[in-house]
Structures are given as structure tokens and as C-alpha cells.
Swiss-Prot record:
Gene Ontology biological-process annotations: photosynthesis
MF terms in GO: electron transfer activity; heme binding; iron ion binding
Name of the protein this chain belongs to: Cytochrome f
Compartments it resides in: Cellular thylakoid membrane
Binding-site list for heme: Y35, C55, C58, H59
Subunit details: The 4 large subunits of the cytochrome b6-f complex are cytochrome b6, subunit IV (17 kDa polypeptide, PetD), cytochrome f and the Rieske protein, while the 4 small subunits are PetG, PetL, PetM and PetN. The complex functions as a dimer.
Membrane topology value: Single-pass membrane protein
Keyword tags: Electron transport, Heme, Iron, Membrane, Metal-binding, Photosynthesis, Signal, Thylakoid, Transmembrane, Transmembrane helix, Transport
Pfam families: Apocytochr_F_C, Apocytochr_F_N
Cross-referenced PROSITE patterns: CYTF
Protein family (similarity comment): Belongs to the cytochrome f family.
Biological role stated in the UniProt entry: Component of the cytochrome b6-f complex, which mediates electron transfer between photosystem II (PSII) and photosystem I (PSI), cyclic electron flow around PSI, and state transitions.
Cofactor(s) required, per the database record: heme
Length: 317
């Protein structure tokens, strides 16, 4: 019964996030998105065998991501994993229609097996305040230890708090006390490549041939066609979508790979690993007992020393 309830909750959560995703496209088509959604739809796991998080396949620029997790946590306890996605305030980028739009952010946290998103009834008031307006989704029904967030407005979500529930090895022998690794990724802004391999308009467009720019045509939607004539008189047409700014003009001589536009991208992706220790309560008790024992030993040594000094003083030594 409990498993059926969890499955229904997962499907409901995914349905809500999908509705939000679709409605955001319909009602806010100019917003610039950072899509963990794409990774979810195209990769069985968000982390490749090399350790690279797959978001980096589309978001080619690198920018820092910072994570804060506690050094150690107790069994069956709720703790915060904080992902920080810094960028300059009021920064805007090129949207899909070529207009300037605010940046969006997204994040993925790959928790160790047994760790998962804490149920809301165990969230503290502080966590509820810090996660207001944030929707968490499991990467898949089978992987409740992988949590994705986004797209979210970047100006108010440069820090994303993930409420995490640790496992209890005393009730589930599949898990153990000790050190665990977390894999974390954070992104701001749109990608440069779609999962299909096609370029977005948020990237530098380059020439695929060498020659002289014969002419530049402006299309009705604001995009360009750059016609390049090689030494044999053959014309190659390079399509440049709306958004990037041309940095070439007619009669310019160019080589293969030379940029035709500026680089409009201002966002980027970053990933890092973190560690957390699942602390055994018996180990904590033992450690406390050890420190108490050391403290008592020190006190006894001091008392013994004073006693010896008194005896020596009485004997005139």
C-alpha cells in the first residue's frame, strides 16, 4: 500500500511539473530556459561513465557552481544540500526569438543510494520558506535519489535548497554508515546545442568554407544568409538565425572556422562533487565517552600531580 502511494505521488509530481513546463512555454515563450528537462528526456542517467553530467553536452560554456552540504548527518534525518549558481545581477541573454530575456537557472543533485528528497511533512519552517516556489522532480521513477529543479527565475533562485532525507541502516541493511559522494550540477541560461545536435541561436556561428563574402541577405524574421564565394566561384550560404550579431560584411575574406557573429552566450554550466558522512549514533556515543574519559584522565593526572607536590613539600624535598 505504501509503495502504491509513493508511486502515485511520484506520477502526480511529474504531471504537475510537466504542466508547469508546457504552460511556461505557451504563456512565456520569450523566457530563456535552463533545461534539466532535456537531460531527463534523453539520458537514462544524468552522469556519464566519465563523471561528466550530461547537461554539459548542451551547455558548452563553463561557469562555477558551489555546493554546501554538512560534513556529517545522522540516520533518518533531514538536512539541506544548498546549490549556489552565481552570476551577475540583471544579466540578460538572447531568447529563442532573438530578444533579450532574463536568465533562468536549473540544478541536478545526484544523491547516494538510499538518500532521497525529504517528504514535506518533515520539512522545517525554515526549509519551507527557503523552498517556496521551487518544484522538485525525481529524475525517474526508479531513481528517487536523483533530484532535478528548474527552470526557475535566476534573479531569485541563485541559491537552491534541496531538503534531503538520509537512510537508516538500522532498519534497512542495504545501507551502511560511512562516507558517501554527491554529484551536483548547476546551470544558468540557455544551451548552445540542442539534444538533437542542432545549434541554438545562443552560440557563435562560423564559416564552413574559405573565400570572400559575396553578399549578406536579411530575411524577414531578422535572420541572415551569408553568401560566401570560394576561389572556384562556388557559392556557399551560411544561415545565421535571429539573435547573434554579425561581425562580418560583404567583400570580407574569411577562412574555414572564422566567426561570422559575436558570442551571445552569457550563461554556463558547472559541476562538482561533495561528500557527506552518515554518522552512526553508537559511534557518536563512543566518541563522547572517549572524550569524557580523556578529560577525566587529565583531571586525575592534575590531582595526582598536586598530591605528589604536597607530599614532597611536607617531606622537605
Amino acid at each position: 500500500m505504501k509503495g502504491l502511494k509513493n508511486q502515485i505521488m511520484k506520477k502526480t509530481s511529474l504531471f504537475i511539473c510537466t504542466l508547469l513546463f508546457i504552460s511556461s512555454i505557451v504563456f512565456y515563450p520569450k523566457i530563456s530556459f535552463a533545461y534539466p528537462f532535456w537531460a531527463q528526456q534523453n539520458y537514462e542517467s544524468p552522469r556519464e561513465a566519465t563523471g561528466k553530467i550530461v547537461c554539459a553536452n548542451c551547455h558548452l560554456a563553463q561557469m562555477p557552481t558551489i555546493a554546501e552540504v554538512p560534513q556529517s548527518v545522522g540516520a533518518d534525518s533531514v538536512f539541506k544540500a544548498v546549490v549556489k549558481i552565481p552570476y551577475k545581477n540583471d544579466l540578460k541573454e538572447i531568447g529563442a526569438d532573438g530578444s533579450e530575456v532574463p536568465l533562468q537557472v536549473g540544478a541536478v543533485v545526484m544523491l547516494p543510494d538510499g538518500f532521497k528528497l525529504a517528504p514535506q511533512e518533515r520539512w522545517t519552517e525554515e526549509i519551507k520558506e527557503e523552498t517556496e516556489g521551487v518544484y522538485f522532480t525525481n529524475y525517474s521513477e526508479e531513481q528517487d535519489n536523483i533530484i532535478i529543479v528548474g527552470p526557475l527565475p535566476g534573479d531569485t533562485n541563485k541559491e537552491i535548497v534541496f531538503p534531503v532525507l538520509s537512510p537508516d541502516p538500522s532498519t534497512n541493511k542495504e545501507y551502511h554508515y560511512g562516507k558517501y559522494s554527491l554529484h551536483i550540477g548547476g546551470n544558468r541560461g540557455r544551451g548552445q546545442v540542442y539534444p538533437t545536435g542542432d545549434k541554438s541561436n545562443n552560440v557563435v556561428f562560423t564559416s564552413s568554407t574559405a573565400g570572400t563574402i559575396n553578399s549578406i541577405e536579411t530575411i524577414e524574421d531578422g535572420s541572415y544568409q551569408v553568401n560566401i564565394e570560394n576561389d572556384n566561384g562556388e557559392i556557399t550560404t551560411e544561415a545565421v538565425p535571429v539573435g547573434p550579431q554579425l561581425i562580418v560584411k560583404a567583400q570580407d575574406k574569411i577562412n574555414v572556422g572564422d566567426p561570422l557573429t559575436n558570442d551571445p552566450n552569457v550563461g554556463g554550466f558547472g559541476q562538482l562533487d561533495a561528500e557527506v558522512v552518515l554518522q552512526s549514533p553508537y559511534r557518536v556515543i563512543g566518541l563522547i565517552a572517549f572524550f569524557i574519559g580523556v578529560g577525566l584522565t587529565q583531571i586525575l593526572l592534575v590531582l595526582k600531580k598536586k598530591q605528589v607536590e604536597k607530599v614532597q613539600a611536607a617531606e622537605g624535598i
